[in-house]
Protein backbone atom coordinates (compact mmCIF):
# COMPACT_ATOMS: atom_id res chain seq x y z
CA UNK A 1 0.00 0.00 0.00
CA UNK A 2 2.94 2.37 0.56
CA UNK A 3 3.84 2.26 -3.12
CA UNK A 4 0.25 2.86 -4.22
CA UNK A 5 0.03 5.85 -1.89
CA UNK A 6 3.32 7.12 -3.35
CA UNK A 7 1.95 6.75 -6.88
CA UNK A 8 -1.10 8.82 -5.93
CA UNK A 9 1.11 11.54 -4.44
CA UNK A 10 3.28 11.61 -7.57
CA UNK A 11 0.16 12.39 -9.57
CA UNK A 12 -1.62 14.78 -7.19
CA UNK A 13 1.17 16.70 -5.46
CA UNK A 14 3.41 18.24 -8.08
CA UNK A 15 5.19 20.46 -5.55
CA UNK A 16 6.58 17.48 -3.58
CA UNK A 17 9.89 16.04 -4.75
CA UNK A 18 10.18 12.32 -5.39
CA UNK A 19 12.47 11.98 -2.37
CA UNK A 20 9.93 13.76 -0.14
CA UNK A 21 7.19 11.43 -1.35
CA UNK A 22 9.30 8.35 -0.63
CA UNK A 23 10.07 9.52 2.90
CA UNK A 24 6.43 10.50 3.49
CA UNK A 25 5.39 6.96 2.56
CA UNK A 26 7.79 5.34 5.02
CA UNK A 27 10.85 4.48 2.93
CA UNK A 28 14.19 4.87 4.69
CA UNK A 29 15.97 6.49 1.75
CA UNK A 30 15.42 7.77 -1.77
CA UNK A 31 17.36 4.79 -3.12
CA UNK A 32 15.15 2.19 -1.41
CA UNK A 33 12.04 4.01 -2.62
CA UNK A 34 13.35 4.27 -6.19
CA UNK A 35 14.24 0.57 -6.34
CA UNK A 36 10.95 -0.59 -4.81
CA UNK A 37 8.88 1.68 -7.04
CA UNK A 38 10.56 0.49 -10.23
CA UNK A 39 10.16 -3.18 -9.28
CA UNK A 40 6.45 -2.73 -8.54
CA UNK A 41 5.40 -0.45 -11.42
CA UNK A 42 8.03 -1.40 -14.00
CA UNK A 43 9.20 2.20 -14.46
CA UNK A 44 10.96 4.87 -12.44
CA UNK A 45 9.01 7.28 -10.26
CA UNK A 46 10.07 10.23 -12.43
CA UNK A 47 8.89 8.49 -15.61
CA UNK A 48 5.63 7.46 -13.91
CA UNK A 49 5.00 11.07 -12.88
CA UNK A 50 5.68 12.40 -16.40
CA UNK A 51 3.42 9.78 -18.03
CA UNK A 52 0.54 10.53 -15.64
CA UNK A 53 0.90 14.26 -16.28
CA UNK A 54 0.83 13.65 -20.04
CA UNK A 55 -2.30 11.48 -19.82
CA UNK A 56 -4.07 14.03 -17.63
CA UNK A 57 -3.19 16.83 -20.04
CA UNK A 58 -4.48 14.88 -23.05
CA UNK A 59 -7.79 14.19 -21.31
CA UNK A 60 -8.08 17.84 -20.34
CA UNK A 61 -7.52 19.08 -23.87
CA UNK A 62 -9.59 16.53 -25.78
CA UNK A 63 -12.84 16.36 -23.81
CA UNK A 64 -15.13 19.31 -24.66
CA UNK A 65 -16.61 19.79 -21.17
CA UNK A 66 -13.13 19.66 -19.64
CA UNK A 67 -11.90 22.53 -21.81
CA UNK A 68 -11.36 25.46 -19.51
CA UNK A 69 -12.60 27.94 -22.09
CA UNK A 70 -15.91 26.05 -22.41
CA UNK A 71 -16.70 26.28 -18.68
CA UNK A 72 -18.45 29.15 -16.96
CA UNK A 73 -16.90 29.37 -13.49
CA UNK A 74 -18.00 31.67 -10.69
CA UNK A 75 -16.45 31.70 -7.21
CA UNK A 76 -18.48 32.85 -4.22
CA UNK A 77 -17.57 33.31 -0.54
CA UNK A 78 -20.34 33.08 2.06
CA UNK A 79 -19.34 33.04 5.73
CA UNK A 80 -16.93 30.09 6.11
CA UNK A 81 -17.78 28.34 2.82
CA UNK A 82 -16.06 28.99 -0.50
CA UNK A 83 -18.18 27.79 -3.43
CA UNK A 84 -17.28 27.11 -7.06
CA UNK A 85 -20.32 27.41 -9.35
CA UNK A 86 -19.50 25.64 -12.61
CA UNK A 87 -21.62 25.50 -15.74
CA UNK A 88 -20.56 23.11 -18.49
CA UNK A 89 -22.23 21.66 -21.55
CA UNK A 90 -25.51 20.24 -20.23
CA UNK A 91 -24.79 20.51 -16.52
CA UNK A 92 -24.41 22.86 -13.56
CA UNK A 93 -22.50 21.93 -10.42
CA UNK A 94 -21.48 23.55 -7.16
CA UNK A 95 -18.36 22.53 -5.27
CA UNK A 96 -18.15 23.76 -1.67
CA UNK A 97 -14.92 24.00 0.30
CA UNK A 98 -15.91 23.09 3.84
CA UNK A 99 -14.28 22.16 7.13
CA UNK A 100 -15.59 18.73 8.17
CA UNK A 101 -15.37 17.43 11.75
CA UNK A 102 -13.64 14.17 12.65
CA UNK A 103 -15.99 11.19 12.93
CA UNK A 104 -15.76 7.91 14.79
CA UNK A 105 -17.19 5.35 12.40
CA UNK A 106 -18.17 1.70 12.39
CA UNK A 107 -17.56 -0.05 9.09
CA UNK A 108 -17.77 -3.20 6.99
CA UNK A 109 -14.83 -3.50 4.59
CA UNK A 110 -14.58 -5.38 1.30
CA UNK A 111 -11.50 -6.11 -0.78
CA UNK A 112 -11.88 -6.83 -4.49
CA UNK A 113 -13.61 -5.43 -7.60
CA UNK A 114 -16.73 -3.42 -6.82
CA UNK A 115 -17.42 -1.06 -9.75
CA UNK A 116 -21.16 -0.93 -10.50
CA UNK A 117 -21.90 -3.94 -8.27
CA UNK A 118 -25.17 -2.89 -6.61
CA UNK A 119 -25.75 -6.38 -5.19
CA UNK A 120 -22.41 -6.26 -3.40
CA UNK A 121 -23.12 -2.89 -1.82
CA UNK A 122 -26.59 -4.05 -0.76
CA UNK A 123 -24.99 -7.00 1.03
CA UNK A 124 -22.42 -4.77 2.74
CA UNK A 125 -25.01 -2.26 3.93
CA UNK A 126 -27.35 -5.04 5.10
CA UNK A 127 -24.49 -6.55 7.09
CA UNK A 128 -23.75 -3.21 8.74
CA UNK A 129 -27.46 -2.62 9.33
CA UNK A 130 -27.77 -6.01 11.09
CA UNK A 131 -25.36 -4.71 13.74
CA UNK A 132 -26.39 -1.03 13.80
CA UNK A 133 -30.20 -1.20 13.60
CA UNK A 134 -30.77 -2.69 17.09
CA UNK A 135 -28.75 0.24 18.46
CA UNK A 136 -31.01 2.74 16.71
CA UNK A 137 -28.20 4.09 14.57
CA UNK A 138 -29.92 3.82 11.18
CA UNK A 139 -32.93 5.82 12.43
CA UNK A 140 -30.82 8.43 14.21
CA UNK A 141 -31.11 11.75 12.32
CA UNK A 142 -27.56 12.62 13.41
CA UNK A 143 -26.03 9.48 11.88
CA UNK A 144 -23.69 9.99 8.92
CA UNK A 145 -23.54 7.31 6.19
CA UNK A 146 -20.32 7.04 4.21
CA UNK A 147 -18.62 4.90 1.60
CA UNK A 148 -14.84 5.13 1.86
CA UNK A 149 -12.68 4.55 -1.21
CA UNK A 150 -9.26 3.57 0.13
CA UNK A 151 -7.44 3.09 -3.19
CA UNK A 152 -7.14 4.71 -6.62
CA UNK A 153 -8.67 2.32 -9.20
CA UNK A 154 -6.21 3.65 -11.80
CA UNK A 155 -3.28 2.47 -9.67
CA UNK A 156 -4.42 -0.46 -7.52
CA UNK A 157 -5.21 -3.83 -9.06
CA UNK A 158 -8.93 -4.70 -8.95
CA UNK A 159 -8.51 -7.65 -6.62
CA UNK A 160 -6.75 -5.40 -4.08
CA UNK A 161 -9.20 -2.48 -4.12
CA UNK A 162 -10.63 -1.72 -0.67
CA UNK A 163 -13.98 -0.12 0.03
CA UNK A 164 -15.78 0.39 3.35
CA UNK A 165 -19.43 1.18 4.10
CA UNK A 166 -19.65 3.18 7.31
CA UNK A 167 -21.92 4.79 9.87
CA UNK A 168 -20.92 7.39 12.45
CA UNK A 169 -20.94 6.27 16.10
CA UNK A 170 -20.15 7.61 19.55
CA UNK A 171 -16.52 7.42 20.58
CA UNK A 172 -17.17 4.94 23.40
CA UNK A 173 -19.23 2.48 21.30
CA UNK A 174 -17.34 -0.74 20.51
CA UNK A 175 -18.45 -2.73 17.43
CA UNK A 176 -18.53 -6.52 17.46
CA UNK A 177 -17.98 -9.32 14.96
CA UNK A 178 -16.97 -8.27 11.46
CA UNK A 179 -17.74 -4.62 12.16
CA UNK A 180 -14.60 -2.51 12.54
CA UNK A 181 -14.07 0.89 14.09
CA UNK A 182 -11.83 3.79 13.14
CA UNK A 183 -11.63 7.56 13.31
CA UNK A 184 -11.99 9.54 10.12
CA UNK A 185 -9.92 12.72 10.40
CA UNK A 186 -11.65 15.99 9.79
CA UNK A 187 -10.24 18.87 7.81
CA UNK A 188 -10.81 20.77 4.61
CA UNK A 189 -12.82 18.95 1.91
CA UNK A 190 -14.22 19.79 -1.51
CA UNK A 191 -17.84 18.61 -1.55
CA UNK A 192 -20.10 18.24 -4.59
CA UNK A 193 -23.52 16.59 -4.83
CA UNK A 194 -24.26 14.12 -7.63
CA UNK A 195 -27.35 12.11 -8.61
CA UNK A 196 -25.86 8.84 -9.83
CA UNK A 197 -26.76 5.46 -11.26
CA UNK A 198 -24.57 2.38 -10.64
CA UNK A 199 -22.31 3.06 -13.66
CA UNK A 200 -22.01 6.83 -13.12
CA UNK A 201 -19.59 6.89 -10.19
CA UNK A 202 -16.29 6.74 -12.14
CA UNK A 203 -17.25 9.75 -14.26
CA UNK A 204 -18.34 11.72 -11.18
CA UNK A 205 -15.08 11.00 -9.39
CA UNK A 206 -13.22 11.76 -12.61
CA UNK A 207 -14.94 15.13 -12.87
CA UNK A 208 -13.93 16.05 -9.33
CA UNK A 209 -10.28 15.10 -9.75
CA UNK A 210 -9.85 15.69 -13.49
CA UNK A 211 -11.96 18.78 -14.18
CA UNK A 212 -12.67 20.73 -11.01
CA UNK A 213 -9.45 20.17 -9.07
CA UNK A 214 -7.01 21.35 -11.78
CA UNK A 215 -9.11 24.50 -12.26
CA UNK A 216 -9.31 25.32 -8.56
CA UNK A 217 -6.80 26.89 -6.20
CA UNK A 218 -6.48 23.59 -4.32
CA UNK A 219 -4.61 20.33 -4.58
CA UNK A 220 -5.48 16.87 -3.28
CA UNK A 221 -4.44 16.01 0.27
CA UNK A 222 -3.53 12.45 1.26
CA UNK A 223 -6.44 11.88 3.66
CA UNK A 224 -9.13 9.42 2.59
CA UNK A 225 -11.85 10.50 0.14
CA UNK A 226 -15.43 9.28 0.48
CA UNK A 227 -19.06 9.44 -0.63
CA UNK A 228 -21.71 10.60 1.82
CA UNK A 229 -25.20 9.16 1.37
CA UNK A 230 -27.85 11.86 1.89
CA UNK A 231 -31.09 10.21 3.12
CA UNK A 232 -33.20 13.38 2.98
CA UNK A 233 -32.22 14.26 -0.60
CA UNK A 234 -33.15 11.02 -2.34
CA UNK A 235 -35.43 11.01 -5.38
CA UNK A 236 -37.76 8.21 -6.42
CA UNK A 237 -36.30 7.40 -9.82
CA UNK A 238 -35.08 3.84 -9.86
CA UNK A 239 -31.50 2.96 -9.01
CA UNK A 240 -30.12 6.50 -8.94
CA UNK A 241 -29.15 7.93 -5.56
CA UNK A 242 -27.91 11.31 -4.36
CA UNK A 243 -24.47 11.40 -2.78
CA UNK A 244 -21.93 14.04 -1.87
CA UNK A 245 -18.45 13.21 -3.14
CA UNK A 246 -15.91 14.56 -0.66
CA UNK A 247 -12.23 14.84 -1.52
CA UNK A 248 -9.59 16.11 0.94
CA UNK A 249 -7.86 19.26 -0.24
CA UNK A 250 -5.26 21.78 0.80
CA UNK A 251 -4.26 25.11 -0.67
CA UNK A 252 -2.10 24.90 -3.78
CA UNK A 253 1.10 26.87 -4.08
CA UNK A 254 -0.52 28.91 -6.83
CA UNK A 255 -4.06 29.60 -8.03
CA UNK A 256 -5.01 28.46 -11.52
CA UNK A 257 -8.12 30.63 -11.63
CA UNK A 258 -7.81 34.27 -10.68
Residue ranges and their predicted role:
Residues 4, 8, 16-19, 28-258:
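A solvent-exposed interaction/effector surface
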Residues 21-23:
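Short alpha-helical "recognition helix" segments of helix-turn-helix
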Amino acid sequence: MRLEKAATLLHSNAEMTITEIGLRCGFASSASFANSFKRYFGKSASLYRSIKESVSTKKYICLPDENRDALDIRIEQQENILSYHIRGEGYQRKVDIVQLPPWHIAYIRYTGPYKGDTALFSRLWNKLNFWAAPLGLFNNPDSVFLTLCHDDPEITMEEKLRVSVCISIDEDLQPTGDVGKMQLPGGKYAVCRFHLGPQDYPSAWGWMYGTWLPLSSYQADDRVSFEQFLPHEQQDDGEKITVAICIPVKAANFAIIS
